[in-house]
Amino acid sequence: MVHAPAKVAAAAAIPLLTPYKMGQLELSHRVVLAPLTRCRSYGNVPQPHAAVYYSQRATRGGLLIAEATDISPTAQGYPETPGIYTQQQIEAWKPIVDAVHRKGALFFLQIWHVGRVSTTDFQPNGQAPISSTDKQITPDDSGMVYSKPRRLRTDEIPQIIDDFRRAARNAIEAGFDGVEIHGAHGYLLEQFMKDSANDRTDEYGGSLENRCRFAVEVIDAVVAEVGAHRVGIRLSPFVDFMDCFDSDPVALGSYMVQQLNKHPGFLYCHMVEPRMAIIEGRRKIAHGLLPFRKQFNGTFIAAGGYDREEGNKVVADGYADLVAYGRLFLANPDLPRRFELDAPLNRYDRSTFYTQDPVVGYTDYPFLEEIDEESRTTYA
């Protein structure tokens, strides 16, 4: 018992809970809510229950990244995902952003276009999804079949870039502190960047520079619209998802980081780790992001299934400035507090990740205090 106070004091000083200055934004800790698709925005309009969900996970000086949000009607690939392209959607986001800001947290919106990761059911007038290619995604083990995409014409690409620009502007109008461009996980930007998907012969295909041209032009447009200090990007050069991989991920990641550095003050680069290896029953971080971390001038956020111990280590080692948590934060709304106390974590229920219920698996994960109160009642 005499050692308990020392343990609490040590826990308060863990690397994940040290303050950090991201550009001009002051963070009180380094535990970031990763963007998580939750499929609960009925009719593509954010709902009041999202204000409960996000404010539960908000702490003073914490950073939350909202779920991937459609930039246009053609951007959708999953049911009930939110948009940011109509005035109704902008107005619906405002009270959600306000709820997070009342907690003193910072809130960024991830903006995306899924490209070919869609079906005609989600597309306007039942049209084919658009992509860099007309190659269809190979059905996965779940049996999900995505529709054959239509290859974007060269003269159509500026419109998609402008959709990203307007989405960023709309996000700022809704009150968000900034935006994260979704350039990861096999969605539209990666369908251009990665050579397994991009088979174009125009200026957006072929060489690495050409394949990255679309993503770079999106970045340029968004930065010009809202300022580099309000823009981050998520990249996953090593990830093979949705039939989207690259023959030289290090070259791809390095090239993209170099393009980010051309914008002075570009806020952050959020990268996803290669798969973690299992060695002697424990996960081992591949540390594959180190070259990009060294090259990038701004804040570097790492993601990829980290736990408390791994997150503390990468911050202490200078491998990352911030660590994004997805499933752990989904299931533990008070995750920074639990990390501080090294408290037990709620287990997540995968079966409720993408259901449309506004409470179950969404806002009903208990806080530590609720568990403690239940224990006291049980043993009283």
Swiss-Prot record:
Q: Report the cofactors.
A: FMN
Could you say which residues bind FMN here?
35-37, 68, 110, 234, 305, 326-327
Which UniProt keyword terms apply here? Fatty acid biosynthesis, Fatty acid metabolism, Flavoprotein, FMN, Lipid biosynthesis, Lipid metabolism, NADP, Oxidoreductase, Oxylipin biosynthesis
Query: What catalytic activity does the UniProt entry give for this protein?
Result: (1S,2S)-OPC-8 + NADP(+) = (9S,13S,15Z)-12-oxophyto-10,15-dienoate + NADPH + H(+)
Which residues of this UniProt protein bind substrate?
A: 182-185, 275
Tell me the pathway.
Lipid metabolism; oxylipin biosynthesis
**Active site, renumbered:** 187
Keyword Transmembrane helix among record annotations: no
Q: Name one GO molecular function term.
A: FMN binding
Q: Which GO terms describe its biological process?
A: defense response; jasmonic acid biosynthetic process; oxylipin biosynthetic process
Keyword GTP-binding carried by entry = no
Which InterPro entries does the record match to this protein?
Aldolase_TIM, OxRdtase_FMN_N, Oye-like
Q: Which Pfam families match?
A: Oxidored_FMN (PF00724)
Induction info: By wounding, jasmonate, salicylate, salt, drought and cold stresses, sucrose, copper, cadmium, mercury, UV-C, fungal elicitor and ozone.
**Which family does this protein fall into?**
Belongs to the NADH:flavin oxidoreductase/NADH oxidase family.
What is the role of this chain? Probably involved in the biosynthesis or metabolism of oxylipin signaling molecules. In vitro, reduces cis(-)-12-oxophytodienoic acid (cis(-)-OPDA) and to cis(-)-OPC-8:0.
Q: What is this protein called?
A: 12-oxophytodienoate reductase 1
Q: What species was this sequence derived from?
A: Oryza sativa subsp. japonica (Rice)
Report which gene this protein is encoded by.
OPR1
